[in-house]
Swiss-Prot record:
It is a multi-pass membrane protein. It comes from Helicobacter pylori (strain HPAG1). GO terms for molecular function: carbohydrate transmembrane transporter activity. PANTHER family: PURINE EFFLUX PUMP PBUE, SUGAR EFFLUX TRANSPORTER. The chain crosses the membrane at residues 16-36, 51-71, 82-102, 110-130, 138-158, 170-190, 210-230, 247-267, 277-297, 300-320, 338-358, 361-381. Involved in the efflux of sugars. The physiological role may be the reduction of the intracellular concentration of toxic sugars or sugar metabolites. This is Probable sugar efflux transporter. It comes from the Bacteria. HAMAP family: MFS_SotB. The lineage of its organism: Bacteria, Pseudomonadati, Campylobacterota, Epsilonproteobacteria, Campylobacterales. PROSITE patterns: MFS. GO terms for cellular component: plasma membrane.
Length: 391
């Protein structure tokens, strides 16, 4: 019996690991344009602020597609669905690597965004299903760790590959790694019938839960602020702080490394007081943005700000996702789809706001605007915390 239990634990952990790897590759490809923005703009003879709208387009496809695509795929067995998504993901990266103009690159990114829409709608609930008993919260933490490693390894390595070869090679390598992950998924995942996915009828039921709706609005607000600044952090560090490309790469690495600390803090502290944890994480996201320009030429201060910012955004993202799942246990996939859509409305809006700020005010002001949006989100958190104190 002991052998059976150990075998179960081993395979369950391996399955969680596969989902963590999947989160790694999906987050790497979503945000790697941030690390390659200047190179892509240069190759197509465009401005960074204009190319940055590619991030907006990607995010808005995800935000618009998450719920309807999840509902359309609600009855499909999950392993088969995941393998289909990875096939499209890989083909889209091949097109990215071959893109002969910006519009072809944009089209390929839309294909990737399509897979993203469904992947993040179903993954949180699936990783909890395959996790070992009594390890559900830790499994969600490992999923977040995969996302954090995308920032630690994915973005810096993507930038290094882009500098050594070119940005097209970065997308080619991502497609190759995704192929290996798909093979692991095919080998390790069990048959996963759709369960508690929810239906279209679940949507109006969830809409009647005011705290849940308040959390979705909070996600849009705080993530809009974050991406107003983060979408253009690479050109900010190079052009405003005037640090070298190597220092820029190292700062992106530090941002991702901080995500590991954020995942650890979530697993240890969230359950003790979820409301205070979310508020503290938001402060860590907001303050570094507001002070970014103030300390623009102090290298060690920028490193510290980026580290704290990375801790904040990672722990905040996991905490908000966990809160959504707690508030909608009867329709986890629908709730996750709306969460993913809300998050990507924030990403797209933030990248758009950042582009507008750059064109109208200048690159140096992105932190002030992003931080101000974050402060509005903090006030909103305070409001819903008081109004729904017993929920």
């Amino acid at each position: 019996m002991m052998i059976t239990k150990q075998s179960y634990q081993k395979f369950a952990l391996m399955r969680v690991f596969v989902f963590s790897l999947s989160a790694f590759i999906f987050n790497t490809t979503e945000f790697v344009p941030v690390a390659l923005l200047s190179d892509i703009a240069k190759s197509f003879e465009m401005e960074s602020a204009t190319v940055g709208l590619m991030i907006t387009a990607y995010a808005w496809v995800v935000s618009l597609g998450s719920l309807p695509l999840m509902l359309l795929s609600a009855k499909i067995e999950r392993k088969r669905l995941l393998l289909f998504l990875f096939a499209l993901f890989i083909l889209s990266h091949i097109l990215s690597a071959l893109a002969w103009n910006f519009w072809v690159l944009l089209l390929s990114r839309m294909g990737i965004a399509f897979t993203h829409s469904i992947f993040w709608s179903i993954t949180a609930s699936l990783v909890i299903r395959v996790a070992p008993r009594n390890k559900k919260q830790q499994a969600l933490g490992l999923l977040a760790l995969g996302s954090s490693l995308a920032m630690i390894l994915g973005l810096p390595l993507g930038r290094i590959i882009g500098q050594m070869l070119d940005w097209r090679s970065t997308f080619g390598v991502i497609g190759g790694v995704a192929t290996l992950i798909a093979l692991l998924m095919w080998k390790l995942l069990p048959h996963l019938p759709s369960r508690n996915a929810g239906t279209l009828a679940s949507v109006p039921i969830l809409m009647k839960r005011p705290l849940l709706m308040g959390i979705y609005l909070l996600v849009i607000m705080v993530i809009s602020g974050h991406f107003t600044t983060y979408s253009y952090i690479e050109p900010f560090i190079i052009q405003i702080s005037q640090f070298s490309p190597d220092i820029t790469t190292l700062m992106l690495f530090v941002f991702g490394l901080a995500g590991v600390a954020g995942s650890f803090l979530f697993s240890r502290l969230y359950a003790k007081n979820s409301r205070k944890f979310i508020a503290f994480a938001m402060v860590l996201v907001i303050c570094p943005q507001l002070l970014l320009f103030v300390f623009k030429n102090l290298e060690w201060v920028i490193f510290l700000q980026i580290f704290l910012w990375g801790i904040g955004i990672t722990s905040l993202t996991i905490a908000l996702q966990m809160r959504v799942l707690q508030l909608a246990p009867d329709a986890t996939d629908v709730a996750s789809a709306i969460f993913s859509g809300s998050y990507n409305v924030g990403i797209g809006s933030g990248a758009l706001f950042g582009s507008i700020v750059i064109h109208q005010l200048g690159l140096e002001y992105i932190g002030f605007v992003g931080g101000a949006l974050g402060l509005l989100a903090l006030f909103w958190l305070r409001f819903i915390t008081i109004k729904f104190k017993k929920t």
